[in-house]
C-alpha cells in the first residue's frame, strides 16, 4: 500500500484516533482484497474506487501488486476534488 502526497497530508490532518481507524481499515482492505468487491466510482472518477470509513472516504486505485491511496477526506468534500 502506498499513499500519494495528498493522501499523506489528509491522514496527517486527522485526529490520532480517526487516523488509526483509517489506516487499520486500509490495512484490512489490503490483507483481504481477494475476498472483497471494490466500490468503483463513475464519471470523472472512473477507474478510482472508494473505501467507506464512517463519514470519511479513501479514494484509491490498484493493480495486481499494489494499492495506491489518493485522498482521505470527509464524504462531503472528497468528490469535489477534481
Label each region the model flagged.
Residues 2-9, 13-20, 53-56, 61-82:
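Enriched for short, Lys/Arg-rich terminal
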Residues 24, 35, 65-66:
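N-terminal processing/targeting junctions
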Residues 27-51:
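A short, surface-exposed loop/turn module that caps and links secondary-structure elements
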